Structures are given as structure tokens and as C-alpha cells.
Amino acid sequence: NTPDWKFQSDVVSHIKSKFNKQINLAVDVCMCSTTLDGHCCILDKPQTTQALFIDLGRKLKQAGADILAPSDMQKDTVKNLKIETQLPILSYIKFRSNFYSSFRDLANSTPSSERFYQISVADPHSAKIIASQYDKDGADYLMLKPGMTTIDLISMIKCNTYKPVGVYQVSDEYLGLPTDKHLYETYQIFDRVGCNFMVTYGARKL
């Protein structure tokens, strides 16, 4: 069945109605929580995938999203969302990682097979190529995920694209921090290497 994205739209609308222009709301664009196999796309159906993402992007814009953040790692998603919504795009550069396991267990989105469209942790060259492509496709911001395991790529991608580059401190990274002081230290490290922004479950503690 085609999702109607009502839950996503309602959440965005509620947040924006409460905070209005006090915040810029960046909203994740993906479908891993709606597919039966836990994948970020409809496997082997790129046109269907893009049609769904465009539909989701339009509805998120109508609900009040300020920035769209596609995390699917599919070809043309950044370009299509930029053209169809005219919103700023924050594009993920996502690696296949074991550090997502806690979130996947909680969201019941563990994929039925390997997410081959994500980048191998042993292949930094692909991250450089993908970042450059997203830049050409119209991305306004780039974000590496996970954070700590991609820290060596931040400077390179910033130099190649001249775009703000941030990190996503994922579930297993965050759960491994025993105190708020440990959290703040990771923030200082990301800032030290030139990270422009940081997404973390502990944002309110910083």
C-alpha cells in the first residue's frame, strides 16, 4: 500500500504550530519505517521510490518543514526534492554501520538484507564522490553518519564542496556515553575538526 505520510505530516505541523519561526525544522526523508523489509527505498523500483519521496517531500513542505533531509542514499533524490519543493536540502552521506542497531531495534526497521546502497566503512573514496554528486544535485548541507567513525572525512568534504558539513551522532554512539561530560567532549571534538553542526540524541544537554 502507498503510505499517506499522515503521521509524518502531523508531527511536523504540530512542532511548527508550537514553535513557529523560533526554529528551523529539518525533517528526515526516508521510508525505512514504512517498508516491510526495512529498506530505505523500494528495491529494484527506482521510479516508484522517487515518486514516493517527491510525494513525501511535498507533504512535509505543506506541513511546515524548513529543510528536507533525505537519508535514503538513492540516486536523484536530492535533485528531485530540490526541484519539486524548492526547500533547502540537507543530504546524508551514510555508511553501513553496526552503530545503528539500537535505533533499528526500537523502530523495528532492521533490514532484511544488507543495505548495499550505503557506503562501506572501508571506502572513503566513495564518500568523496557521493558528496560531490550531492553538491552538484543542489544539496545545501551535507551530513556524515555515523559521526565519530567518519571524523576523518569532514575536512576533505568541506574543501571539495564548500558546503557546511555536519555529523549525526547515532544511537549506539550516544548510548556509549556514560555522562553528559562525555557527550560534551564529543561535541568539542567535532567542533575542533571543523564540523558545522551536530545531530545528537543529547542535543538538549549541550
Annotate the PLM regions.
Residues 1-206:
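Alpha/beta enzyme core
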